[in-house]
Structures are given as structure tokens and as C-alpha cells.
């Protein structure tokens, strides 16, 4: 699998893949992961390659542009990525406890434009299995007033919640779905 990651990095498809971003998520081969938002092409490509054919890769796209980008990435890297069209304020077409990991790609700070970001995170909580993890990837230096993802994740039901790391201009915030 590392061979595939290195090959994708060398080919220069889209943005240069940062293995740190992929490894910080903790996604493992064979896992079922859902990425919310599709702003960082290299993150999605790396995560899809990491879970491999024995895992499941899916993207929850808020709009047609994100859906097209995710489908394009899937074709370019030869990965099976299920693109889910989601609408804010509506139930998502995703089964309960369907995923081991949710990655929120907020590198373009799209959460600022959402009317109800807490509902998005509650849907993510519902989509995770008990013991599943969520990770939010967001810029350290925000163009907009920063969103307190630790607070939002806690309000959505994730416990514990922590800043996992800040590196290369990105902040990684992690939460766990517990059913206590």
C-alpha cells in the first residue's frame, strides 16, 4: 500500500500528497471511511489508496462541484469512491454505523458557509460505528473567524475531543463516538 501512496506522490496528480495528512487521520487498510467535503484532492486520493480494495471509501458532497471532483479523483487514482449527495438540513442517504472513520475536510473553510454545522457533525456521529473516530482537518490560520470544532464535536456527541496536532499549517481535531 505504501508503494501506491509513493507512486501517487511521484505522478503529481493534483496537489502534492502530504503523507502526514493521510497518516494523521489514522485510517487503516480495510476500514470504511467517509470524507465530508472534498477540497483537498490529495487527502481524498491518499485515504482511498490507504483503505485499499478491502475497505470502503465514500465522500459526502455538499454540491455538484464537490461530487464531480470526488468522481474525478476516483477515476485518476483507480479507486472505488462512493459519492453521496448530501443536503444540509436533510437526513443523509447513509446508514447508521456504516463507517469506522469520518474525515471532515475543512481546508477551504466551507463550514463557515453552513447554516447548521452542528447538524452535519450529528449526521457524522450517526454514520460512525460505536468506537469510530472523526477527524477535522482545518487551517491553523483561518481566513474567516475560526470555528471551535472542539466545542461543536462535543455538542454533536463525540467524547473525548482533542486537538491531535498542528502541522504544516493545518490543525487536526479528533473525536470518538462513544455510546455511553
In which residue ranges do the predicted regions lie?
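Class I SAM-dependent methyltransferase SAM/SAH-binding core
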Residues: 34-35, 39-91
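A short SAM/SAH-binding and catalytic strip from SAM-dependent methyltransferases
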Residues: 100-115
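Conserved beta-strand signature within the Rossmann-like core of class I S-adenosyl-L-methionine
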Residues: 131-139
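A short acidic, Gly/Pro-enriched loop at the edge of an enzyme's catalytic core
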Residues: 28, 89-103
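A short glycine-rich, Lys/Arg-flanked "PGG" loop and its adjoining helix->strand segment in the class I
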Residues: 48-49, 116-130
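Core SAM-dependent methyltransferase catalytic element
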Residues: 156-180
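Conserved SAM-binding loop and adjacent beta-strand
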Residues: 3-19, 38, 144
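Conserved alpha-helix/loop element of class I SAM-dependent methyltransferases that forms part
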Residues: 11-31, 42-46, 50
